Amino acid sequence: MSDRQAALDMALKQIEKQFGKGSIMKLGEQTDTRISTVPSGSLALDTALGIGGYPRGRIIEVYGPESSGKTTVALHAIAEVQQQGGQAAFIDAEHALDPVYAQKLGVNIDELLLSQPDTGEQALEIAEALVRSGAVDIVVIDSVAALVPKAEIEGDMGDSHVGLQARLMSQALRKLSGAINKSKTIAIFINQIREKVGVMFGNPETTPGGRALKFYSSVRLEVRRAEQLKQGNDIMGNKTRIKVVKNKVAPPFRIAEVDIMYGEGISKEGEIIDLGSELDIVQKSGAWYSYQEERLGQGRENAKQFLKENKDILLMIQEQIREHYGLDTNGVKAPEDEEGQEELEF
């Protein structure tokens, strides 16, 4: 053994003695290097994300204009986590969560942890406590724009508080990022958009809360309404475009188009028809849609209704789409920790 190797071994032993076993290791020594995921609740979004869902132990930012479907996207993720037996928490800084709508999306509201904090500091401290417990699989913060610093709440209306929220987010994310990775918790931050004053060229839109969230996020999703979905003169929902603006775990800039129906959330039938047609799993002849020898219906809405009534055919098409994109049909679960759900050491 060379002197350099002996010196390195001694340094590694010293680090492990001081900071604990596993504090430093060779990258190839990790037992499972695959990124563990949770399905997003939308097959189109799972394929756009490139790994079959949201990566565990990472920060996700979902932003877009008002009423574009940001909270709907987050609630679908909560429903998926709960279906896998996981624990979910929703920090409602906007004080606007509709439990009836959440239930319609498949969220078990009896098991969902809900907090409606008074200040931004309180919201982020609650989020940190939940993450550090190691017992929560997903935490949703709705929204960053509503995380008002305590100094601003206690001050007068006209007072200037320049950069307070950005400083709060920067400090919180420095503390949270390591804990989120260690506990394998998915942290979804919902954000609004603002317009910068005096921008003549380029995109004037920005997100509140400073730049820290942009840096710490592994995935950033931009949610926008593309068009209204009508049945006769009645508006039934919106065609929504979700763009993966940033992705550290797969190639970015992919786009998922989904139907968000009022009172129902993301239409699984709509995205199955669209993805199936793209891959020629579902055949389209004129206005008719068919699968193998089975006619699904004339027109997209009739085909959606047929799949809603015939779940076995829906699941068969879904499985073929997942196989084509190399996605796990059941979603990938995080490896079980030997210590179970005991509080993590940080």
From Swiss-Prot:
Task: List the InterPro entries.
Answer: AAA+_ATPase, DNA_recomb/repair_RecA, DNA_recomb/repair_RecA_CS, P-loop_NTPase, RecA-like_C, RecA-like_N, RecA_ATP-bd, RecA_C_sf
Give the PROSITE patterns listed for this entry.
Answer: RECA_1, RECA_2, RECA_3
Which residues bind ATP per the record?
G64, P65, E66, S67, S68, G69, K70, T71
One of the GO biological process terms = SOS response
Sorted UniProt keywords: ATP-binding, Cytoplasm, DNA damage, DNA recombination, DNA repair, DNA-binding, Nucleotide-binding, SOS response
Q: Name one GO molecular function term.
A: damaged DNA binding
Q: Which GO terms describe its cellular component?
A: cytosol
List localization entries.
Cytoplasm
The function of this protein is: Can catalyze the hydrolysis of ATP in the presence of single-stranded DNA, the ATP-dependent uptake of single-stranded DNA by duplex DNA, and the ATP-dependent hybridization of homologous single-stranded DNAs. It interacts with LexA causing its activation and leading to its autocatalytic cleavage.
The record's comment on protein family reads: Belongs to the RecA family.
Q: Which HAMAP family match?
A: RecA
Q: What is this protein called?
A: Protein RecA
Organism in which the protein naturally occurs: Bacillus pumilus (strain SAFR-032)
Q: Which gene encodes it?
A: recA
